[in-house]
Amino acid sequence: MRGYFAASDEIAFRMAARGIPKNSVHVTGIPIMPVFAQHLDRKACAEELGIAPDRTTFLLMTGGAGIAGGETLIERLLGLPGDFQIVALAGKNQQLLANYRSLVARSGGRLFALGFTSAIERVMACADLAVTKPGGLTVSECLAVGLPMVLIAPIPGQEERNADYLMEQGAAVKAHDAVALEYKIARLVGEPERFARMRASMRGLGHPDAARAVLNHVLNDRR
């Protein structure tokens, strides 16, 4: 093996601790699509989605399979005071999309339910906070665009370690249930300085050009 690519400095350190030569490990981040390195216009993206560009926007991403109690999460969020909107993604799960849409009518124009999208970067460009499971790619995409996260339902193992890492870095908080989610988002919204620090931490940890970095290392190694 001529080289390795690591998602973070800590992973590179752990690889070295297992005997892998340090000079063969390159910290590039997880490769993601180049669109996440672009600066997208929030107003234009919001108009495409039919949402207000100037309202605080929570993006709920529970994965295509959804999570137990996703509708309860939305109902708790809708109970928060303030001028905000929720964009809830259901992926290709038609039943989940139908469940989310059943809540739209009584949301007072604050809930927008979407199915699968191939342009998630344009949805993220409209958001101020993501409520999501801490999967590797989702985390990498949020980091790249500087989107703070409230983490829910991590799978034991890798997702739990992802959550721990982000919380240690001040880039995310974790909610164990719907009540905790409501409480923590209310706290974040009421503390704009903390919100700003989280966004800065996200951008500092992000590797929007990870794919290019990997490619450059590979091509240079072949010369």
Predicted regions located by residue number:
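A short alpha->beta transition loop at the rim of the catalytic pocket in nucleotide-sugar-dependent
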Residues: A127-D128, G146-P148
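Acidic donor-binding loop of glycosyltransferase active sites
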Residues: A125-G135
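C-terminal "capping" alpha-helix adjacent to the active site of nucleotide-linked donor transferases
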Residues: E168-G170, H176-E193
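Donor-nucleotide binding loops and adjacent catalytic segments primarily
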Residues: L40-C126, E160
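A nucleotide-sugar donor-handling region in carbohydrate enzymes
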Residues: M1-G64, K92-N93
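C-terminal alpha-helical cap of glycosyltransferases
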Residues: H207-R223
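Short alpha-helical segment that forms part of, or immediately flanks, the ligand-binding pocket
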Residues: E121, V139-V145, D164
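A short, well-ordered alpha-helix in the C-terminal region of glycosyltransferases
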Residues: R194-P208
